[in-house]
UniProtKB/Swiss-Prot annotation:
PANTHER family per the UniProt record, alphabetical: ANNEXIN, PNPLA DOMAIN-CONTAINING PROTEIN
TM stretches of this protein: 17-37, 48-68
Function noted in UniProt: Probable lipid hydrolase.
Designated name of the protein: Uncharacterized protein R571
Pfam families in the record: Patatin
GO cellular component, one term: membrane
Chain positions of motif GXSXG: 51-55
Single GO biological process annotation from the record: lipid catabolic process
Residue window of motif GXGXXG: 21-26
Presence of the UniProt keyword Transmembrane helix in the record: yes
Motif (DGA/G): 183-185
């Protein structure tokens, strides 16, 4: 049953926010945050924000001072499909650069969004007030790499975000300090685990689509009919395996699990406005249904 009378969560209760990877399900994250910040939590009380993949984009906007209404506007106006597919697909790019698209325009857009709010070109982690944590994967060492004010103060934020969103095979991985970096979800798709020492003051947002259980396992067989389906399935398998290995009841108890009941893939390009609005509403509805467990914790 939905919580019909919103009750604010006190400043002392919540100070950490963890946003999982989820591709185009990012619209649902924004909907969830809209409901949370409008009715339950003052966003100024959030001190540390961690994000993976699309979660890293939203986490960054929150950390540098965008309001949830501003973030909603940006997410609905930005053309992710065009920004990611900024070049013609060729097998040469996939073979030589390990991805279908360079996505340079997407990185430039992320940099513009950051610069517009901070008024700083190539803004680094040390130049913002909140503690922003961006999760990436070092492909050469096959391990998680964290970028934050504490660990990498001089790192350019837009570059770290570009690494974190480098979905396998779709986007070219990023060469940094001699190593290749890819989607953070390949090794850590839900960064709530970074808050083990402060879990009772943390809220995480993650997903379960119509074919998933809350723990990330699939309910039914996923069809693979062409090369693109195969690539997407391979990427989702890596993200799912990292998620399943990390999730447990103690994390689910601190999580809003957004239910996506329509047949919309997290990697479905060319979402129309109706689909974006549906995902946004899924986020709002899931918070209304689940926030009570966090209030009563």
């Amino acid at each position: 049953m939905e919580n019909s009378t919103p009750k604010k969560i006190s400043e002392s209760q919540i100070k950490n926010l963890a946003l999982s990877g989820g591709g185009f399900y990012g619209f649902a994250v924004v909907g969830a945050l809209k409901e949370i910040f409008d009715n339950y939590i003052d966003p100024n009380n959030i001190k540390t924000i961690s994000g993976v993949s699309v979660g890293s984009i939203i986490a960054t906007m929150l950390a540098i001072g965008y309001s949830i209404d501003e973030i909603t506007k940006i997410m609905f106006e930005i053309d992710m499909d065009t920004l990611i597919k900024d070049s013609y697909f060729s097998y040469y790019t996939l073979w030589e650069k390990f991805g279908m698209y360079n996505a340079d325009k997407l990185e430039q857009e992320i940099e513009r969004i950051i610069r517009d709010k901070t008024h700083i070109k190539n803004c680094t982690f040390s130049q913002i007030e909140k503690n922003l944590i961006i999760v990436t994967t070092n492909l050469n060492y096959q391990r998680t790499r964290i970028f934050s004010k504490l660990e990498t103060p001089t790192m350019i934020i837009s570059k770290a975000v570009r690494m974190s969103i480098s979905y396998p095979f779709i986007m070219v991985p990023v060469l940094f300090e001699g190593d290749l970096y890819g989607d953070g979800g390949e090794t850590l798709n839900y960064p709530i685990t970074l808050f083990d020492d402060d879990l009772d003051k943390t809220i995480g947002i993650t997903f379960a689509n119509h074919n998933e259980n809350d723990d990330g396992t699939l309910k039914t067989r996923l069809p693979i009919n062409n090369f693109y389906d195969y690539i997407v399935s391979l990427g989702l398998t890596m993200n799912r395996s990292s998620y399943i290995s990390q999730i447990s009841s103690k994390y689910l108890d601190r999580s809003i699990v957004i239910k996506i009941n329509e047949d919309i893939s997290s990697m479905q390009f060319n979402l129309d406005l109706k689909q974006k609005e549906y995902l946004f509403e899924c986020g709002i509805k899931s918070v209304k249904q689940q926030i009570i467990k966090l209030i009563n914790h």
